[in-house]
């Protein structure tokens, strides 16, 4: 049976007018008129819009089925597409056949009603929230973002590399990682991430293994052979952070490029962000407008358009600290050189002071990862954080340390064992090259594009501390 989606009906109405079609979907609303005609509002998730189906009482199951339909019921409908006689919709389907595929058990307790539900309420029914307008819009935006990133990276000459989800290495150094080794008694657990070469028979891999916090170290090995590569997949952090900015499981885009320095990757990151925003404004404008209206972020589209035409402002970390220390604003967290900036500082700089995307460069080495290239002052590393109005940091990156002796020193300074990173050190022993990369948090990007205020709404099934219900 040939079926057609609502988005195709809307886009190809001129060709489909007065032709019989078949479509599937779910009932959003049902309205019965005094003229014994029922109007069904049908959606199938292919677009924001629904399709009105006009059902006359001459259908054989009009009394037994049609008049009993409630929000959420699934149906198959056949009929003719025509111009609507009403003013609230452009087209409608005159039904010739309707079959109910699935009823709603006890409609009075169905969690998704026609009223507007709060985002907090919908998090408790994450398995049903895709049926709402807002999460349908977010899902389509996420899909286009995912596809556009792969397309853009391919166009820019990058090769995709799938990096492992299970790893023996800690990319960030001393990160809180999830164990995926088989369970051991506490007395048998190793105290260090790096085990000796002696295998532990109780462990599946013969040594401790973890869920990855980043694919960067692995993808660096491919950058040192293929020049321009990227990985894009799930990452995991076992941090005890119960905020609207943190997830235990999230996705990261991580490009890595050989023969590049910090300034080059800043340009690449800025260009990529603008290309992504441009694509989403072209392909998902209806869904973005709905998000802006639903969340009451009425300046969302203007903010995205302003970003497209903005020039990123560069500022040294040291200068950013001086600026924050001398400004009139009172912060909850004390400002001092050597601190990691908090969200309140990032938002002040990007939203209030500069009112523009900014990149903060050359952070103190003590607050950054071991793999970042040490600057000549021996105090800072060649790092960068891109901040945008609305959310603060959206990209973090650096030039990588390509000098083996300095890398070894940085590992020791971070209390990491060089033997744990033997293969990573090999990249510096065999034809080392300057190389750089960055990470773009996918859910952070979704928040920026949609105007969402809680990152738990940017992922289908959020994983956070003390919460894994689905």
From Swiss-Prot:
Protein keywords: Aminoacyl-tRNA synthetase, ATP-binding, Cytoplasm, Ligase, Nucleotide-binding, Protein biosynthesis
GO biological process, one term: asparaginyl-tRNA aminoacylation
Enzyme class: ligase
GO molecular function terms noted in the UniProt entry: asparagine-tRNA ligase activity; ATP binding; nucleic acid binding
One GO term describing the cellular component: cytoplasm
E.C. designation(s): 6.1.1.22
UniProt key word Aminoacyl-tRNA synthetase: yes
Matching Pfam families: tRNA-synt_2, tRNA_anti-codon
Alphabetized SUPFAM superfamilies for the sequence: Class II aaRS and biotin synthetases, Nucleic acid-binding proteins
Subcellular location: Cytoplasm
UniProt KW Cytoplasm keyword: yes
Catalytic reaction annotation: tRNA(Asn) + L-asparagine + ATP = L-asparaginyl-tRNA(Asn) + AMP + diphosphate + H(+)
Subunit note: Homodimer.
Family: Belongs to the class-II aminoacyl-tRNA synthetase family.
Name this polypeptide is given: Asparagine--tRNA ligase
Native source organism of the sequence: Blochmanniella floridana
């Amino acid at each position: 049976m040939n079926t057609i989606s609502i988005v195709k009906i809307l886009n190809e109405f001129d060709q489909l007018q007065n032709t019989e079609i078949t479509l599937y979907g779910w009932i959003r609303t049902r309205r019965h008129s005094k003229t014994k005609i029922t109007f069904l509002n049908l959606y199938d998730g292919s677009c924001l819009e629904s399709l009105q189906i006009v059902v006359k009482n001459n259908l054989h199951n009009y009394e037994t089925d049609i008049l009993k339909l409630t929000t959420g019921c699934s149906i198959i409908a056949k009929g003719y597409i025509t111009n609507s006689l009403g003013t609230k919709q452009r087209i409608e389907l005159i039904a010739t056949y309707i079959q109910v595929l699935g009823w709603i058990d006890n409609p009075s307790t169905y969690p998704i009603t026609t009223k507007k539900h709060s985002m907090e309420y919908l998090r408790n029914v994450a398995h049903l929230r895709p049926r709402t307008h807002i999460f349908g819009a977010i899902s389509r935006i996420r899909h286009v973002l995912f596809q556009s990133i792969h397309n853009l990276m391919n166009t820019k000459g990058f090769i995709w590399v799938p990096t492992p989800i299970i790893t023996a290495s800690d990319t960030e150094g001393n990160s809180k990682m999830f164990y995926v080794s088989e369970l051991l008694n506490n007395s048998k657990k190793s105290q260090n991430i790096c085990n000796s070469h002696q295998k532990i028979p109780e462990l599946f891999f013969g040594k401790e293994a973890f869920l990855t916090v980043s694919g960067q170290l692995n993808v660096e090995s491919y950058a040192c052979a293929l020049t321009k590569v990227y990985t894009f997949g799930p990452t995991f952090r076992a941090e005890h952070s119960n905020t609207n900015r943190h997830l235990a499981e999230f996705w990261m885009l991580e490009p890595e490029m050989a023969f590049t320095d910090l300034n080059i990757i800043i340009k690449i990151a800025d260009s990529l962000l603008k290309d992504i925003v441009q694509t989403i404004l072209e392909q998902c404008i209806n869904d973005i407008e709905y998000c802006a209206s639903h969340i009451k972020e009425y300046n969302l589209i203007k903010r995205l358009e302003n970003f497209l035409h903005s020039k990123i402002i560069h500022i040294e970390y040291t200068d950013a600290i001086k600026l924050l220390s001398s400004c009139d604003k009172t912060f909850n967290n004390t400002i001092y050189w050597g601190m990691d900036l908090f969200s309140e500082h990032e938002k002040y700089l990007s939203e209030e002071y500069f009112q523009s995307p900014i990149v903060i460069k050359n952070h103190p080495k003590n607050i950054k990862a071991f793999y970042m290239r040490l600057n000549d002052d021996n105090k800072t590393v060649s790092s960068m954080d891109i901040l945008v109005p609305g959310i603060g940091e959206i990209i973090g990156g650096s030039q990588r340390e390509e000098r083996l002796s300095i890398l070894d020193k940085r590992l020791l300074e971070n209390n990491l064992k060089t033997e744990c990173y033997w293969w990573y050190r090999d990249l510096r022993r065999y034809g080392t090259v300057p190389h750089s990369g960055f990470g773009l948090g996918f859910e952070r990007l979704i928040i920026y594009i949609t105007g969402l205020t809680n990152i738990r709404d940017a992922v289908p099934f959020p994983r956070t501390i003390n919460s894994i219900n689905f």
